Amino acid sequence: MADQWGERMPRSVSLLQTVAVSVGVAIGSGIFRVPATVAAQLHAPGPIIACWVLGGIIALCGALTVAELAAALPRSGGIFAWLLESYGPLPAFLFGWTELIVIRAAALGAIATIFAEYLGYFVPLSAVQVRYTAALAIVLIGAINYLGVQRAAALLSATTALKYLVLAALGLLAFTATGGSGAHFSPAWPAGVPLSLLASALIPVLWTYDGWADPATMAGEVSDPQRTLAPALIAGALCVMLVYLVVNIGFMYALAPAQMAGSQLIASTVAARIPLLGGAGPAVVAAAVMVSAFSGLNASMMTGSRVFYAMADRGLFFHAAARVSPRFNSPAVAIWLATALGVAYVLENDFAQLADKFILGIWPFYALAVAGVFVLRRRRPELPRPYRVWGYPLVPAVFLLASVLMVLNALFTDPRNTGVTLLIIVAGTPVYWLRAQHARRR
C-alpha cells in the first residue's frame, strides 16, 4: 500500500544510514586516486589545496540547497522527482535517460575499476583481468542489493565508518609519522597558473565529492523523511569535506607535488613512509581502499537503481523496472538493470573516461535541480518546507554560477567529450516523445 507521498517500499532507512549513503558514495575510491591526478594538472600546493577547498564549498552549497527539496518532496528518485515537480516530465525523463546511458553506469564502472586495481596489489592482474574483476564486483553488489535495503544499508554503515576512520588516520599520520616537510608547501602559488586549469582540475575533484545529493534518491525508503533528509544531506557533505582536506594536506606534507603527481596509488605510497605500519603499510592501505571502493559501489548501486525505479513508477520508463520483490522489498528489476549497465561500461572504458563521463553528465541536472528551489518557491508557495535553504538566495546562486562556469569550461577545454555527453542528453528527447505517443495510443 502506498503512503501519503505515493511510495510503496517500507520506510526503514535511519538517519545514520542516510548519512552513510552520502559519505559512502563520496568516499568510494576517487580520493585514493584523484589527488595524484590533480597534482599532475596543477603542480603547485596553493592551487591544489584551493581546488579541494573550492570543490568542498560547491558541494556544500549544493547540499544546503537540495536539502529543501528533499524535505519538501521526500519521494524516490531524488533529482528525478524534483525535476518532475519543477519542470514537468521531459526534463525529468532526460535526467533519467542520462542516468541510464551515462551517469550511473560510469559511476559503477569507475569505482569497481579502482577496487580491481588495488586488488592487483595482492594478486597480479593484467589490464583485461582488472576489467573482468571490476565487472564481477558489480554483479556481487547487485546481488547484495537485491536481497533487500536493510542488508545493503547495514553493510554500507559498517564499511563507511571503517573507511572514514582509516582515511582520517592516514591523513593525520602523514603529518606526524612520514618524515615529510613543510617545504612542500612553497612556493604556494607560482605565477602562470591559469584559472581555466584550476577549473579543469575541479572536474575530478567534484567527482570525489559527489554523493551529497544521493541519499534523496532513496527518500521513499527513509523513515521520517521530512526530519531526516535535510540534516543527513548537510552532515554528509561536511564530513566528506573535512576528511578530504585533512588527507590532501597530509599527503602534501609527506610528498612534494611532483611526487604526488607521479604516484598513481598515492595512498599506498604515503603509507609506505609511516614507520608505525612497518612494511605492511602499503598492504594495509590497499586493503582499506578495496573496502572503501566496495562500500562506494554498494552505495552507488543503492541510489542509482532507485532512479530507474522512480521513473518506471511514474510511467516514464518500462513498467517492469517498477517491480518490487515481494520477498525482499527491493526494486529488483531496477537493480539488475543498473548492474548490467555498470558491467557493460567497465568492460569498455578506462578510469579517466568513466570519471569524466559521470561529471559531465550529472552537472547540468544538478544545476536544474538547484534552480528548482527558485521555481518551486514561486509556483508552489504552499508546499510544506520543514527546512529552508540557509543563505537563500546566495547559496543556491553560488552553486548555479559554479555549475555554469564548469560546463562552459568543459566545452572549451574538452569539446569532444563534452559535446558527446550533451548530445546523449539531447538524444533522449525523441525517445521521450516516441514513448509518450506510444502511451497515448495504449
Model-derived regions, located:
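Membrane-interface "cap" regions at the ends of multi-pass membrane proteins
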Residues: 1-36, 40-46, 59-60, 64, ...
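Flexible loop linkers connecting adjacent transmembrane helices
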Residues: 2-5, 42-49, 64-93, 115-123, ...
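Helix-loop-helix junctions that connect adjacent transmembrane segments
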Residues: 5-10, 45, 49, 126-132, ...
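Select transmembrane alpha-helical segments in multipass membrane proteins
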Residues: 12-22, 88-100, 133-137, 192-205, ...
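Hydrophobic transmembrane alpha-helices that form the core helical bundles
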Residues: 37-40, 60-138, 142-146, 151, ...
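TM-loop-TM module centered on a large, flexible mid-protein loop between adjacent transmembrane helices
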Residues: 81-82, 88, 120-125, 232-301, ...
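Membrane-interface loop-to-helix entry segments
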Residues: 129-180, 192, 233-236, 358-368, ...
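C-terminal membrane-solvent junction of multi-pass transporters and transport-like membrane proteins
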Residues: 155, 320-330, 366-417, 438-441
